[in-house]
Design a protein with these regions (language model features):
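A short, amphipathic beta-strand motif
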Residues: 17-25, 56, 97-99
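Short, acidic, small-residue-rich periplasmic hinge/interaction motif at the N-terminus
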Residues: 24, 36-40, 73-77, 91-135, ...
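Short Pro-Gly-centered beta-turn/loop motif in secreted/extracellular proteins
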Residues: 33, 59-67, 75
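Short, acidic Ser/Thr/Gly-rich low-complexity loop/linker segments typical of extracellular
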Residues: 42-57
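A short, solvent-exposed loop/turn motif at the edges and junctions
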Residues: 42-45, 67, 71-83
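Short, surface-exposed beta-strand/beta-hairpin micro-motifs centered on an aromatic residue
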Residues: 53-62, 159, 185
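Periplasmic plug
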Residues: 122, 159-207, 220-227, 260
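Primarily recognizes Gram-negative and organellar outer-membrane beta-barrels
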Residues: 180, 203-245, 259-987
């Protein structure tokens, strides 16, 4: 009986099989990630199914002996069906090898989408975003795609962050694109050519060559160009005219191959470089910045690669003009109530720049590596601004704005008023200031870097020599007029300051570094390095005053010669107004820094983890010659020692799950001018003092990142956490004169500044067919900010402490199938902050939005893109800032010709004209609310022409922009995740 049971058990065990294989593109051999593999019986009954992993592989375990159909589907590819007969199979493991799939050439006419492309995946240390999973308006640039990526943010200053990491460069197929200017790619690269976007930490040149992590990683976005668009020329012409005299033109032509790339880009617009929508429906997007901006750009970029030589370079010209208005109100924490201030400013600027860079990497043989990076730049900047401000005993937000303006005018004129309400406002005014100025500057510089590496064996022993050098010359001038009015009760006369500054400055630097790496055990290395760095800076500011000029006289000259400092000065001289040299306001400084850096680094490389740890010691010798405020200091020297510990751990759980932990510390010295006992009263309302007793500060940063991906469910999880602590940070102790509103600050060391936070993101499909997806991102942050107070006013506790808690939650629910994409989304930011100084010491404010987005793509070439959101604010100081704004954006477009190469669109941003630009900041010293002008509502007609001349069979494409070209089409397109090519060679 036992033998019979054993035989039966063995027979049943051998009647089950494990079926595996790898799905690849027939033409490119590229792995197809998240392809759907289903096993059915011959009558169609479903048995089991899998999605391929990052290598295109699948495995089905414990399949019973029978005859089956193996069905494979993938977006943009022809379905594949194979017969699988296990009744005659003897081996338990059935390897079907490489199964190829062909792209669907008639997908435009009769596409039946059977799977949806995953939005984001994890591959090793990289987050890989599938561009075809995001439906974008026709003609969209890269920035429009980045805005929609889970965990990605574009901040007000243009900084791009992915999962909390700031992006420093953008690459195209692994090659640097305009080297140091990521905005060129964001504003100009068309999204229809992009297959996927990979975010990862790229090693420095030194680390990549030596294999030893030096801790100088930079987060990059690496764009993979669609294979069908390689080996040919492609371009896009995009022109638009709109209401409010708005225009937007953009042109680019590109060639990308496996070994070279060329790009020519040009643009001109006055819409602030914004794309369609401007953030409507997706929370508080202020990426179009402050002010009414116009820009013009022209640039060329190239990169080439052979077995031994890589070259790349760019030349770039840009012009920017900006008309910026802002209003701010603040509460300074100087007493129990706070000192209140309000200001209005208007500025105009005109900036032009020209830059060029080059990169060469030469590998004469397997043992040598030489990298050379020179670059040069020139810029010219002109500015003109004017504004007024006031300081108050109570919050001016409580008063009518018109009467507040009248009260400030009467206060400045010291005039009698009959309106009791205006008289009450005047009683609260401490001082007012009116100012106007114009500036001019030009800057030119050049620098270069040469790195030479020699491997001494193939086990990790090598030596590296690295040299850098550069210089910068600049010239700036400023002509300004300022009038300050004080309370009559102070007995102080109004302060009139008419000044001219002429400031030439020079700087130069060079460094030399030697690095030696030694293997001390199997896959364990020790690196020694030494670097000498010399820096020289010289600035000689000449200050001149016009004592015989009234404030209004100089203002009139500034108005007449806007943007022309030299013209205004010449007019004043022709009218007999003499410049008087002011020795106390003139400033001369000459720095010399001699830095030595010695470091040691240990790196351990294992299959599951990489660990590097090290420390650098930085002795520094500085010499300063300084003259200011009538005092002169010659050959002031300082000798200090800084140190920087680092730790970096990367742990790989599997191909789709990884953890990274990074720690670094850094010693920072106070500036030598802060150490000088000088009282700077050049600004009568803000007096600054020096402090010779300042100590160095030490900052510690700990960051952790975790990513994982489930291919079967298209589920990505990504998270980050951070903690920052600064010991002996330099803070300003503020002494505030309540009668005049004059603040006197003195730098002092303080402890207690720290912050921490946690971010968690998820993108997942929630149904079997992957039509429904949820994207979620949560950010939590806490800050503890401290500063010193006037000990006379606060004898018991002279520290101001502001504690802040912030929570941000964004959620998006999307349905995506064939010709339709619809989403519901929301975004909420809650901030709770307390301060120990004020009587009313709690601040709670909310920014939240909720809305919907709709994208319809008809098969005849018409697309509709629309989003609507309700954006709300609560808890701001002024009632006019606590708003509900219904933002609605819409675009309708139609593509012409068989290849959809010509598209005409009509778009309207902020149809209801309700958008505004408001922000709040709080720290240990103040709470500040501000609003500014920017580009809001306008309509525009665009014409977009896509020129694609390929070496292959593909023509013009619509890609992820909702068109119906050979890439993307109705449901996305070629393999998401790119770079996931099959391992090894074809068997």
């Amino acid at each position: 009986m036992l033998a019979m049971l054993l035989c039966t058990s063995l027979a049943m065990a051998q009647s089950k099989f494990n079926v595996k294989g790898i799905i690849i593109d027939k033409e490119t051999d590229e792995a197809l990630i998240a392809a759907s593999v289903q096993l059915t019986k011959e009558d169609g009954t479903y048995v089991t199914g899998k999605a391929t992993d990052m290598n295109g592989a699948f495995e089905m375990k414990n399949v019973k002996k029978d005859k089956y159909k193996l069905k494979i589907t993938y977006v943009g590819y022809q379905p594949k069906e194979l017969d699988l007969d296990l009744t005659t199979q003897k081996e338990k493991n059935v390897d079907m090898g490489y199964l190829t799939m062909s792209t669907d050439a008639v997908m435009l006419e009769a596409a039946t989408v059977t799977a949806q492309a995953s939005k984001v995946q994890v591959k090793g240390d990289s987050l890989v975003f599938n561009a075809d999973a995001y439906r974008l308006p026709p003609g969209s640039a890269l920035e429009e795609l980045i805005k929609r990526l889970p965990g990605a943010t574009i901040e007000e200053d243009g900084t791009v962050k992915i999962n909390g990491k700031a992006v420093s460069k953008i690459l195209v197929d692994g090659k640097e694109y305009f080297i140091n200017d990521k905005n060129v790619a964001l504003k100009n690269l068309p999204t229809n050519i992009i297959d996927n976007v990979k975010a990862y930490d790229r090693k420095s040149d030194l680390a990549r060559v030596t294999g030893i992590d030096d801790g100088e990683d930079e987060t990059v976005l690496d764009l993979t160009v669609k294979k069908g668009m390689m080996n040919g020329w492609m371009g896009q012409l995009n022109g638009g005219m709109g209401t409010e005299k708005r225009y937007n033109t953009r042109a680019n032509i590109n060639r990308f191959t496996d070994s070279e790339s060329y790009s020519l880009v040009a643009s001109a617009n006055n819409i602030g470089d914004r794309g369609f929508g401007g953030g409507g429906g997706r929370g508080w997007g202020r990426w179009n910045g402050n002010g009414l901006r116009a820009s013009k750009e022209l640039g060329f970029n190239f990169a080439t690669e052979t077995d031994k030589l890589e070259t790349g370079g760019y030349i770039w010209h840009r012009y920017d003009g900006n008309d910026s208005w802002s209003q701010s109100s603040s509460q300074n924490f100087v007493n129990k109530i706070g000192a209140f201030s309000q200001s209005v400013n208007q500025s105009y600027s005109s900036n032009a720049s020209l830059s060029a860079g080059f990169r060469l990497e030469w590998k004469p043989d397997s043992m040598w590596n030489i990298i050379f990076r020179p670059n040069a730049s020139y810029s010219r900047n002109r500015g003109y601004s004017y504004g007024n401000s006031g300081t108050y005993d109570s919050d001016p937000a409580e008063y009518d704005e018109k009467k507040l303006d009248e009260a400030e005018q009467a206060f400045g004129d010291r005039a009698e008023v009959s309106d009791s309400e205006i008289d009450d406002i005047i009683e609260t005014i401490v001082n007012t200031r009116n100012s106007r100025q114009q500036t001019y500057s030009n800057n030119k510089g050049m620098n270069g870097e040469l790195q030479i590496n020699r491997k001494l064996n193939n086990e990790g022993r090598n030596i590296t020599l690295r040299m850098t050098g550069g210089f910068t010359n600049s010239e700036s001038t400023q002509l300004s007029a300022s009038s300050i009015n004080y309370r009559a009760s102070t007995g102080m006369d109004n302060d009139i300051n008419n000044r001219y500054y002429d400031t030439p400055s020079r700087s130069r630097n060079y460094s030399i570094q030697a690095t030696y790496s030694e293997p001390i055990a199997k896959r364990t290395y020790l690196q020694f390095s030494y670097r000498f760095n010399y820096r020289y800076n010289k600035s000689d500011r000449g200050a001149y005053t016009y004592d015989d000029l009234t404030y209004s006289d100089l203002v009139n000259a500034l108005k007449t010669h806007r943007y022309d400092v030299a013209g205004a000065v010449d007019e004043l001289m022709s009218l007999g107004h003499e410049q008087l040299y002011d020795n106390s306001l003139s400033q001369f400084s000459e720095y010399q820094n001699f830095d030595h850096t010695a470091g040691i680094m240990l790196r351990i490389v294992r299959d599951k983890y990489n660990l590097s740890a090290g420390v650098e010691i930085l002795p520094q010798h500085s010499v300063l010659n300084y003259k200011y405020m009538g005092k002169e200091y010659n050959d002031i020297t300082r000798n200090v020692v800084n140190f920087t510990p680092t730790l970096n751990l990367r742990y790989k759980f599997n191909d789709m799950t990884n953890l990274q932990v990074r720690y670094n510390g850094r010693t920072s010295q106070p500036s030598m001018t802060n150490l000088l006992e000088i009282t700077d009263d050049s600004d009568p309302l803000n007096i600054r003092m020096g402090n010779s007793k300042l100590k160095p500060s030490f900052s510690q940063n700990l960051r952790a990142f975790f990513n994982t991906y489930d291919a079967e469910h298209q589920r990505s999880l990504f998270s980050h956490a951070y903690f920052q602590l600064t010991q002996n940070s330099i803070s300003n102790r503020t002494y505030y004169d309540e009668s005049t509103g004059v603040s006197t600050t003195k730098p002092e060391n303080i402890n207690g500044n720290w912050s921490g936070g946690l971010g968690l993101g998820m993108s997942t499909a929630i149904d079997k067919e992957k039509y429904f997806t949820i994207d979620e991102f949560t950010n939590f942050g806490y800050t503890n900010s401290v500063g010193y107070l006037d000990p006379v006013k606060f004898p018991d506790n002279d520290k101001s402490t502001t504690k802040g808690l912030s929570l941000n939650q964004s959620l998006s629910f999307t349905y995506r199938k064939d010709w339709l994409e619809a989403s519901l989304n929301g975004d909420m930011t809650y901030t709770h902050q307390t301060n120990n100084v004020l009587d009313n010491n709690t601040f709670n404010y909310w920014d939240f939005s909720y809305g919907a987005e709709l994208n319809i793509m008809a098969p005849w070439g018409t697309t509709l893109n629309s989003d609507i959101s309700m954006n709300s604010r609560r808890g701001y100081s002024q009632a006019s800032m606590n708003t509900n704004e219904l933002i609605w954006n819409v675009m309708i477009s139609h593509s012409f010709f068989k290849d959809r190469s010509l598209t005409v669109s009509l778009e309207w941003n902020d149809i209801l004209k309700e958008q505004s630009n408001i922000s709040r900041t709080i720290n240990a010293f103040q709470r500040s609310d501000s609003r500014s002008n920017t580009i809001y509502s306008y309509g525009m007609v665009r014409v977009i022409y896509k020129l694609n001349i390929f070496g292959g069979k593909f023509g013009a494409s619509g890609g992820n922009q909702g068109g119906f070209g050979n890439f993307g089409g109705w449901g996305g397109g070629r393999p998401g995740g790119g770079g996931g090519g099959r391992p090894g060679g074809r068997r």
